[in-house]
Amino acid sequence: MAADDKIQMWNPNTGRPDVKIDRAKFDAVRKAILQALPRKGSAIPFKELPLAAELNLPDGQIPGGGSVMWYVTTVKLHMEHEGELERVAGETPQVVRRVK
């Protein structure tokens, strides 16, 4: 992986760019989240998403290391910004639903 092979994360709460993360980590976490929400309309409480995603990660870990909770949260926010996921309105605690 090239040193500059990073992807810019976006935060839907601010509409602004957030951190940049390694593309390999992004791809692995995004895939794990989508596997945890296998169909359009699938939903899961956010507090359960990190464990559900972790079960779909290679060896249950972030490739190259890192906090599963941090990466799942960061990638989930980016996926909300991109319209792949959405928060279910009126649900407390937060529930996340697959849109695409």
Q: What are the language-model segments listed below?
A:
Residues 32-40, 52:
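Short amphipathic alpha-helical elements of helix-turn-helix/winged-helix folds
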Residues 1-35:
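Long, low-complexity, charged/polar intrinsically disordered regions in eukaryotic proteins
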